[in-house]
Amino acid sequence: MISPAKINLGLEIPFKRLDGFHEIRSVFLKISWGDDIEIEPASNGVFELFSNNEIILEKRKLYDQVSERGDIKNNILYKTFIKARSLFPELPGVKIHLTKRISPAGGLGGGSTNAASLLNFLFSWRPFFTSDEMFVLAAEIGSDVPFFLGEGHAFVTGKGEILEEIEVHHGQGILALTPQVMNTSEMYSLLKKPLQESASQKNGNTLSKNLISILKNGDWSSLQGRLWNDFEPVAFQLHPELGVLKDKFLEFGSSYCSLTGSGSSMYGLVQGLEIQEELLQRLRQEFSNLTFVRFNF
């Protein structure tokens, strides 16, 4: 089954919370592209991972370092299994076959989506888990993990654990898998957001009626200027070539283009399959050193 990547439609970071996390506001979309993962119970009660690394060459080593070929104790799948097993010793062992395509340090939720896939598998052994217990455990593993437990898209606030499911029109896009490594913690620190109590700022914790309508109707060009990613100025200052890439996305036919997460992956949304194909070909011709993939949602 697919362990899907996500993209962010807008990512606002209004302030840093007293608990050390940053408050976020974003629309998270699951897309059709991602990792392939197969999980089965292991009778001996242990954790086994067998993975094929299909990540872009420049970032391939980042995954291998935490795979079964490196220090697996730093792998999010291993951490998820150990944490769940410590709470519920009755849980079986697992054998996981993973085809890894989602790059680390890309803003696509590659680790979080794998963790959620494993939690959903373990959840099938009821009554060991309730949905509330699984959600709490997911939030402890990673801020983006709760989103991947569900099936739909969501407006996400808090540190990533407050989810409001939303309706989004079917759409298509092109994803650029870029080689730049963006450390999430460093990117947040470069934003230099003020410290503020979570409860002190309520405005913006809901989507406007106008944005809800745009998302339902799929008018992606109307998102420009209404949804933005606060990390883009920092990312483009560190890596000006990402700003050039965004300009070309828009020049070549993308209706809306943005960095996803804290970077470095970038995507463009389009109005229809013909424009999607034309955009893909023009980007591949302009940036022959980069990897581009089609996706829909």
Curated annotation (Swiss-Prot):
Pathway named in the protein's UniProt entry: Isoprenoid biosynthesis; isopentenyl diphosphate biosynthesis via DXP pathway; isopentenyl diphosphate from 1-deoxy-D-xylulose 5-phosphate: step 3/6
Enzymatic reactions: 4-CDP-2-C-methyl-D-erythritol + ATP = 4-CDP-2-C-methyl-D-erythritol 2-phosphate + ADP + H(+)
Domain of life: Bacteria
Residues annotated as the enzyme's active site: 6, 144
Alphabetical list of InterPro entries matching this protein: GHMP_kinase_C_dom, GHMP_kinase_C_sf, GHMP_kinase_N_dom, IspE, Ribosomal_Su5_D2-typ_SF, Ribsml_uS5_D2-typ_fold_subgr
GO molecular-function terms, A-Z: 4-(cytidine 5'-diphospho)-2-C-methyl-D-erythritol kinase activity; ATP binding
SUPFAM superfamilies assigned: GHMP Kinase, C-terminal domain (SSF55060), Ribosomal protein S5 domain 2-like (SSF54211)
Keyword flag Nucleotide-binding: yes
UniProt entry keywords in alphabetical sequence: ATP-binding, Isoprene biosynthesis, Kinase, Nucleotide-binding, Transferase
Enzyme Commission number(s) from the entry: 2.7.1.148
Pfam family, one: GHMP_kinases_N
Biological process annotations from GO: isopentenyl diphosphate biosynthetic process, methylerythritol 4-phosphate pathway; terpenoid biosynthetic process
Family: Belongs to the GHMP kinase family. IspE subfamily.
Function comment: Catalyzes the phosphorylation of the position 2 hydroxy group of 4-diphosphocytidyl-2C-methyl-D-erythritol.
UniProt-listed NCBIfam families: ispE, PRK14613.1
Name of the protein in its database record: 4-diphosphocytidyl-2-C-methyl-D-erythritol kinase
Organism name: Leptospira interrogans serogroup Icterohaemorrhagiae serovar Lai (strain 56601)
Taxon lineage: Bacteria, Pseudomonadati, Spirochaetota, Spirochaetia, Leptospirales
